[in-house]
Amino acid sequence: MSALARVLVVDDSPTMRGLISAVLKADPEVEVVGQAGNAMEARAAIKQLNPDVVTLDIEMPEMNGLEFLEKIMRLRPMPVIMVSSLTHRGADASLAALEIGAFDCVGKPAPGDARPFGDLADKVKAAARSQHAAYRATRPETAAAPQPVPMSEYRAGRKVVAIGSSTGGVEALIAVLQKFPANCPPTVITQHMPPTFTKSFAERLNRICAPVVEEATDGARLQTGKIYLAPGGERHLQIANRSAPCCRLLDRDPVNGHRPSVDVLFDSVAELAGRNAVGVILTGMGRDGAAGLLKMRHAGARTVGQNEKTCVVYGMPRVAYELGAVEQQLPLASIGEEILKLTTARKEGAD
């Protein structure tokens, strides 16, 4: 990567190309090296300009963004940030893009949005620095989905699992949760996502994982065999009620620039569950969740961080590790099984 993050903006709308370019040019560490209005123009521009990162509209005429993304990942793997409408259809397409290999997704702004595209410039810089392209290029295209541990081989103890993730988290969560049996420990997750995206993601996880996965609702009781995903962009997820633990959705300002925030979730788990918890921090940029994971460890919880080699962005796990919050760092493929080891009931009774 050069000193500046060099980005190509691809969108069929001249207005949207101009807006994205203006947002990116406002950051002195980002250089917009070109624009393209369709896949053919984009392919030529990538060959000519060799950008570090591409922003790509999902909904384009002729060859759409998903089709073009597949070609990029097959022929020239590189970090691509998808730009999508904040609709259910847009969310489904964004999730498909992330599974194909997109670095991240951002939503198109609503009229009057004070911060159009949010932290897009930061995402572009993180993408340019990341190992994402190299990781994608070396991953087998036909890798089989992880198989869940059979229910007969796992007996849940009394522990609750809390997981936090951001950039790269969609693929990481799929890899972890597909190892879980249908009788997995109650699991609460905060993944940084735009509004509407988490509902689609929960539905997707529910189809491909053995446990029940749902978007968290206020007051939902934590149950064995259920996974609860914080709704994107609206409220923070906590756990509450020591005698009958449940989800609590909290109206509060963003924490660490995020709502929902991983720190808010981890803080509540540290206070409520103490040593009867496992905290996991996965790939993501920034530091959200690091301080909360440290609180969990100090409260007696077991803690796991994703290692640098398998992270799309080694940000949140790095800060957590440097703070002393991470008991053990593991490659992504080992984390699901490790969570199950840490939460299984002891032979003499639930721990």
Swiss-Prot record:
One of its GO terms (molecular function) is protein-glutamine glutaminase activity. Keywords: Chemotaxis, Cytoplasm, Hydrolase, Phosphoprotein. Phosphorylated by CheA. Phosphorylation of the N-terminal regulatory domain activates the methylesterase activity. InterPro entries: CheB-like, CheB_C, CheY-like_superfamily, Sig_transdc_resp-reg_Me-estase, Sig_transdc_resp-reg_receiver. GO terms for cellular component: cytoplasm. Residues 154-346 form the CheB-type methylesterase domain. The keyword Mitochondrion does not apply. It catalyses: [protein]-L-glutamate 5-O-methyl ester + H2O = L-glutamyl-[protein] + methanol + H(+); L-glutaminyl-[protein] + H2O = L-glutamyl-[protein] + NH4(+). GO terms for biological process: chemotaxis. Pfam families: CheB_methylest (PF01339), Response_reg (PF00072). PANTHER family: PROTEIN-GLUTAMATE METHYLESTERASE/PROTEIN-GLUTAMINE GLUTAMINASE (PTHR42872), PROTEIN-GLUTAMATE METHYLESTERASE_PROTEIN-GLUTAMINE GLUTAMINASE (PTHR42872:SF6). HAMAP family: CheB_chemtxs (MF_00099). Contains a C-terminal catalytic domain, and an N-terminal region which modulates catalytic activity. This is Protein-glutamate methylesterase/protein-glutamine glutaminase. It comes from Agrobacterium fabrum (strain C58 / ATCC 33970) (Agrobacterium tumefaciens (strain C58)). The lineage of its organism: Bacteria, Pseudomonadati, Pseudomonadota, Alphaproteobacteria, Hyphomicrobiales.
